């Protein structure tokens, strides 16, 4: 396959993902989301978002963020400025692998800074590849669908997870997002 055909195929995936998202939103389809939009989302200004980001308790080494202790705090953001769409960022690393102790309580803060889309930060044992219209089950913890940020503010929410040892994945279940790379791995040991 020549380069031009590869580019057309790649662009076609984004078009299909976008059309799927529009169709799902228009028809009110929620099967792609872990849970429906809820009221636990709070709003934050950019300075407040920056203050939230520094609360992550992990240490970065390459493409891995390692956590230690009985309680860890993971702060993930969707599409921070300077990062490609769609992606998660943790400690300024795109879709890093998270290394978490099995006996830890994991407090997660998820921030949506992407003004054009809602996102989700959901945890599953199902690994990639992911479909354009995902129906990833089971979701063991997560945020569900976020509101689209408006009025110069960003949305964020928190949840707590008590994992057992194993391999998990954090994913965005908005149609097309995980299929085009908005996911990462979690190793709990």
Segments the model singles out, each with a brief description of its role:
Residues 51-60, 65-77:
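Metallo-beta-lactamase
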Residues 18-28:
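Bacterial N-terminal signal peptides
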Residues 60-67, 94-122, 156-164, 168, ...:
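Beta-strand cores of secreted/periplasmic/IMS beta-sandwich domains, seen most often
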Residues 85-86, 116-151, 178-181:
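Histidine- and aromatic-enriched segments that form or immediately flank copper-ligand environments
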């Amino acid at each position: 396959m020549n380069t031009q055909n590869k580019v057309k195929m790649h662009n076609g995936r984004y078009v299909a993902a976008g059309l799927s998202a529009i169709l799902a939103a228009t028809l009110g389809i929620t099967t792609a989301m872990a849970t429906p939009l809820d009221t636990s989302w709070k709003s934050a200004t950019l300075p407040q978002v920056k203050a939230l980001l520094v609360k992550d308790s992990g240490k970065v080494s390459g493409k891995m963020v390692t956590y230690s202790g009985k309680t860890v705090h993971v702060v993930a953001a969707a599409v921070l400025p300077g990062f490609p769409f769609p992606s998660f960022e943790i400690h300024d690393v795109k879709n890093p692998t998270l290394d978490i102790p099995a006996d830890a309580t994991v407090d997660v803060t998820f921030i949506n800074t992407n003004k054009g889309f809602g996102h989700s930060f959901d945890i599953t044992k199902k690994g990639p590849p992911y479909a354009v219209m995902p129906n990833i089950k089971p979701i063991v913890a997560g945020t569900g669908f976020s509101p689209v940020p408006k009025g110069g503010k960003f949305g964020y929410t928190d949840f707590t997870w008590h994992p057992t040892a194993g391999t998990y994945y954090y994913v965005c279940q908005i149609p097309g997002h995980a299929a085009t790379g908005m996911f990462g791995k979690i190793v709990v040991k």
